[in-house]
Amino acid sequence: MKVLFAASEGVPFVKTGGLADVIGSLPRHLKSQGFDVRVILPKYSDIPICFREQMLKLTDFMVPLGWRNLYCGIEKLKYDGIIFYFIDNEFYFKRQGLYGFEDDAERFAFFDRAILEVLPRIDFQPNIIHCHDWHTGMISTFLKSHYRNNPFYQDIRTVFTIHNLQYQGVFPRTILQNVLGLGNEYFGLDGLEFYGQVSFMKGGVNYSDILTTVSETYAEEIQLPQYGEQLDGLLRHQKRKLHGILNGIDIDIYNPDTDPHICVNFSRETVDKKHINKESLQKILCLPMRPDVPVFGMVSRLVSQKGLELIGSVLDDILALDVQLVVLGSGEKHYEDMFRSASRRYPDKVSVNIMFGNTLAHRIYAGSDIYLMPSAFEPCGLSQMIALRYGSIPIVRETGGLRDTIQPYNEYTGEGNGFSFTHFNAQDFLYTLKRTISFYRQRNIWSIIVSNAMQCDFSWYKSAQKYQDLYKKLLFNGDR
């Protein structure tokens, strides 16, 4: 079976979020099961030069977009056994950053149209194009509108994965004809129309053969007004083709037993060595080296989705306790300022690192005792799975993938791998945090919780098998 992954970012080339991790991992696992899997991305100037220098140009051609024909080059690079293709157009992709430009509608409409145009030119006819998030939402639309009578494309099926419904790619109606080259028949409730504008996300939802999202709970949540981002009615209507499949993590990269980024390697059997990583983390971040104090870790975008409103409401209450807090990430300025202010007021308790550093991220997972993730919503979440692997016990809100991966500790049965609370309420969060600390102080119980956490399997194996089953069902049973 031939599968083409189409996405706007992917590890190791460019990354702004969890989507890139999926693109860097899932294709490899499918390939190991005998699939011919390839990936196609924009050729951003942000891609490190060490990769750009290895790319081989295959061809170039003109892509029709609205009333124009635009240059497109296609380049190829094999990495970790996977063939990656890169769509090249310097006007659209030679910029600092990936998203947030005024012409994003044009940029990603071009990308989606170029993907379809390039396939016969590289002699690759996939059975399935697996599209990811709004940036690739027009691929299934274009297949229906521009390519349905072309024999090359008639048997291609599409899967569209929603990684985060909050980002929908909504643009003025004028792009319908000027950029997309579509008639008014595509501007309706069963098409691209979204409150008088054009939604790329709706293109993916309405015109793809199968919809997936990145956890079972999130697939249920987005059909509700609270989480549906004004598309809940449409998603309820399309629920027959909607499937929730939990993301996995790359257990080779996130393996405390072999991780080159951390001070001392350890495993579930040698978890006593974890304390050395804690001491190292405290030392490099200039925190008092106290083995008895619980270290809370956060590696996160600093945005409202991550529950920072809750943390801000009770931050002084938390820091009045005998704890340390380590934060790594960047995002909205008022949250950055909130943590900076806390580090000035509590210099012996708080280390704030407004940036992203991969090595420091690994060291926080390895050196922290408790991992904070009280998200307002979380489609899947990878950080809590990584934290479990390193024996850092998550405190989460029961939403999306957090609900699917964290089993609250039961002191009567000894089961559970973390702690959770249900309502988006600061006092509930604070109560859960204090309860977690009380178990941390009971070292025998804490050892059981850490052991439970580190034996969890969130590799891609089970998730990749579910995607395989979905692909086969789509192709061989004709279910759409």
Swiss-Prot record:
Residues that, per the record, bind ADP-alpha-D-glucose: 15
Protein's UniProt keywords contain Glycosyltransferase: yes
Coiled-coil annotated spans: none
Gene Ontology molecular function, alphabetical: alpha-1,4-glucan glucosyltransferase (ADP-glucose donor) activity; alpha-1,4-glucan glucosyltransferase (UDP-glucose donor) activity
Keyword Glycosyltransferase applies: yes
CDD domains xref list: GT5_Glycogen_synthase_DULL1-like
Family to which the UniProt record says this protein belongs: Belongs to the glycosyltransferase 1 family. Bacterial/plant glycogen synthase subfamily.
Annotated protein name in UniProt: Glycogen synthase
